[in-house]
Amino acid sequence: MRIELLLVVLIFMISHPGVGVDAIVEKEEVSIEVISLKNFKIHKKQRVQILTPEGDKFARLSYAEDEFIRNREFVVRVYDASGDLVDTFTKNVFERELLFKGANYYDDAQVYSLDVSRQNHPYTLEISSITHREWMFDFSWNPISSESVFYKELSLTISRPADLELEIYTNSRIQHTASLEKKVRSDFFKLGGSLGIKKEPFGLKKSGSLVELIFKNFDYNGYRGSLESWESFGLWMNELWRKKSNLNEKALAEIYPDGFQNLNDSAKAKLAFDCIKKNMRYVAITYGIGGLQTASAQKTFQSGYGDCKALTNLMCSILDMVDVESYPALISAGKNDAWIDPNRPTHNFNHVILCVPNQGDTIWVECTSQNAPLNYLSDFTDNRFALLLTPEGGKLVKTPSYFYHENLASRNTTLSISSTGEVEIFFEAEYERLAMERSVFQLKNAGYQDEGLIRYFTNLKSFEVENLEVEEYASDNPRMTVSLRIHDRLFTKKMGKKLLFTPFFYTGQFPAFEEEERTEPIYFRRGYTYVDTIDVIFPTRMTLDKFPESRSVETDFGGYQLETNLLSEAEGVRFVRKVYYKEGEYPKENYSEIKGFFDTIKKDESIKLALIPKS
């Protein structure tokens, strides 16, 4: 069997040159037994052969538990290259720690971990685990991960009472069969002979699941609900949050000391938000049912802290008392936000923000941030689906997105090079909207050291930061200004009488594409514009031996202009560069053009210029 399996993998590798295999998942079986909406049993068996140290990730095992999820069994058997059993581990030897740590977390989830990797390869693991759950909205099955793993046989089985409704979505590669016996329906899903899929950069967000199971009805700690529609799920969330909006008049007087009768909705929202930013502290609370159910507004106001649910509920309650319409909005936040299908209601949310309709001029509020201005969503929550919890139920909407010309970075740099090759760098910049989010300088106000920031965003090697000032301006069009002065002793490289240098010392700000071919469309979720002016002041009696050519490229997805001109007020040269690329989806047929566009920018950025003595 082992020789047969290795032969299959060898044939596969020959037909897929350049692809190495670090591990072979010989077999994986997942079985879900639905006893009731409050009782689920999940049994997972896996046999995996680990061939290289890179495949050791399969030997780093973990599972999590909380009030509603309990692991009943975890057994690991380790076999050496000869197939002999050399070790056995059970759940009692796993190390336990809190899933979330820190003063700003209140959570009952615990993670158990164990590393059973071995120094000698190959070796084989047989893993068996049994988990009991008390609730389930859905189940996504996606056992395929790394490109360098071969999967021989994968299967998923779910058995349930025949009258329990289940929405099933499968990948086209999946074999799906079903049976009905003694009022129990079983669905069987199978996939075999597959290599892991390499994820292409800047791709469309889509479901990564081979199989997705959505329970039409569910029971969460006694709260029964439905995923028949977004509306029904929103109604269930409303019930979960019912009677949590109580807030007394004394609290209202503290928020609006001068009254609110003469204020418009926007002004009322701003005062409420200012109060929350000033007086409330963010604490993540996911203990038990608190993972989905908010604390009461009055309790949050009195305690002075809350999680995203509680702070959003507090502001929503404040606005309700002053006759301003607002709705909590469930959202999948972060750069790795979940894929949401408008036609497939489910619970893929991990955060809550607030939506204030404001008579059609919608205001969005990130209630957990003490820095974000009113009506500005950063790249943490922008440009994605959110579920508004309206009195009529859930309503799926899209959060605002910003255009490429709004996410603007304008930077002015002067490089004064001495005859010894040292340089004095004067850098001034203004970042707007999401360009500010991408700027490393935003970390300065979080206490990061100046030298660390400079090393992160430049290729400078030996420098002293003489001055760094960062100012942020809060508004619905937020911006940040930076003033920087650096002395670098090794900016140039001396070769005979020449001084070699690269004027563009910024790094990692544009998309990079390595592969020569593309199988999926290219998707820029956000667009940006960068305008750089770099003045290079030559040392006395030196000049450039060759001036770079100007360049201008315009495409459907972006543009690039580079101009080179002599300075009139000093001995030197000015580089003016403008780069922009637009948000949007572009067909894979355009990949070569897009890759070439950014390759050209990268090549120009790395250009080596030479200063030589004047003749």
Name each region found by the language model:
Residues I3-I14, M315:
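Sec-dependent N-terminal signal peptides
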Residues G18-S615:
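A sensor for short, sequence-defined functional sites
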